[in-house]
Amino acid sequence: MRAASDYGEPGPALERFAHERVEGVSQEEYPAWGDIKYLEPCLKVAFADGVRSVVLRYAKAAILTDGEAPELVITLADEHYPLLVDLHYRLWREHDLIERFAVMRNTGDAPIRLEQTLSALWHLPLDETYRLRTLGGRWGGEFQISEVSVPLGKQIIESRRGITSAHANPWFGIDRNGSASETHGDVWFGALAYSGNWKIVVERNAYGQTMVAGGIHDFDHTWKLDAGESFTTPSFVAGFTAEGYGDASRLLHRYQLDVVMPRSTASTLLPVLYNSWYVTEFDVNFENQAAAARKAADLGVE
């Protein structure tokens, strides 16, 4: 776990014109749709009376220590409607990662329709030279690295296939001006733990503020939150390293082994499936399968 002194001093304060309202440039942890806010909202709802603006205010906070990792829970409450939002922050110290998710709670008597419920939003230091790295591909060409300078406006990676696949992977990496390599350089990175329709939005405004928001895709999706019910978003795990993309990969890999995978299999060698019909196409018989098995044995396959 790195110390706070490892990360240097905060960047310069934002300079804005007098006619630019603070609501338009404030860096909220979980912005809701409504008022004069122009960046990607994490939360967008429709109340039973047709009102769609959400005005969230801090209500309380708690630190939980009875789980696998210490967890901060910040509760926000709408000023006018019975809607509570719990922001969860799990600190995985040994992995240098923060896991975030949100819980929406309807404490009233009427249903609330959830139209967008992202898991988290991450703010980056002020800079206009960021490079975004993503992973995409196809059958036979999985996990191709794509790199692009973060433009003014939005850059969206997404999947509308109903699954997470080689075509679009819910992961991002960001560095300054393409200066990071596998072994050195500042890298901000994260992965969304969700296998359905998802999106990650990277957005930079005219003042050089850059943020990353992600979660369940709002495309063709709404959720009816009845009275007394709650809705929990998937987790969005993110971190920072000054040691390049290689260290970012290893931090996520160790997290997957130590936290995500079942305890019964995380520390054991898993069996390998040898897809033998590829070498014979559909002409499968005992002789050619036995020959393939002998070659597999020479490679160390059990």
Pin down the residues of each PLM region:
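Polysaccharide-binding surfaces and accessory modules of carbohydrate-active proteins
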Residues: 1-203, 219
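Short Pro-Gly-centered flexible turn/kink motifs
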Residues: 53-56, 223-242
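Short loop/turn motifs at secondary-structure junctions
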Residues: 98, 113, 232, 300-302
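Conserved, mostly hydrophobic/aromatic
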Residues: 102, 227-228, 274, 296
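Active-site beta-loop-alpha junctions enriched in small/polar residues
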Residues: 117, 195, 236-238, 274-279
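Short acidic, Pro/Gly- and aromatic-enriched capping/linker segments at domain boundaries
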Residues: 208-226
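Short, Lys/Arg- and Gly-enriched loop/turn segments at beta-strand edges
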Residues: 239-251
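An acidic-aromatic substrate-binding cleft motif
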Residues: 251-302
